[in-house]
Amino acid sequence: SQHEQIECWNYAVEELSIKPNPMKKTTVKGSQFEQPLLEYNGACAGCGETPYAKLVTQLFGDRMMISNATGCSSIWAAGGSAMAYTANKEGNGPAWANSLFEDNAEYGLGMLIAVKTIRTRIANNVRKALESDMSEETKAVLQDWLDNMNVGEGTRDRANKLEKVLQNEDSEIAKKI
């Protein structure tokens, strides 16, 4: 039974770290060194869809937003109480949602519009904050975020830095951001 392997599993999941990719992530070989955020799917043997879904998670990781249509992919991705998409060590993973009515294009467009609206609001607040009396360190981090807000790589690091410096600020605009 699997009970004999619980200790090994816990060690692998909790103690082993994800190694840095020695190659460019955007190459076929290099993409395979990235952590997949799709695992234990319920697809049929030989399904050609899941390798592509796994590859996309390796290329875009926790920045992915998936607007799924009801069909085979909704069954292998989220059948019953299981979810094939997973999270990294920081607890971040792809955002997955499913529309029952085969309108996932419109549903996904709504997700995109919502994200763009939120990001525009944040950018406007960042511009206001840059004109305020915040510390120079905070302003440098704010400017870096603003300059690179549409650059996917490094987004998580910039967001973490921004969150950290804003905790030291006491202004209303810092709270809004």
Q: What is the role of each PLM region?
A:
Residues 1-28, 92:
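Non-heme iron-sulfur electron-transfer modules
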Residues 4-8, 77-82, 86-88:
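Short acidic, glycine/serine/threonine-rich loops at helix termini
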Residues 19-21, 59-63:
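Long, compositionally biased charged/polar accessory segments in the mid-to-C-terminal portions
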Residues 33-60, 143-177:
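Cofactor-pocket helix-loop regions in the catalytic cores of large enzyme subunits
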Residues 62-67, 72-75:
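Beta-sheet entry/capping signal
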Residues 72-77, 83, 98-104:
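Short connector loops at secondary-structure junctions
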Residues 101-173:
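N-terminal leader/propeptide and maturation segments of large enzyme subunits in energy/redox metabolism
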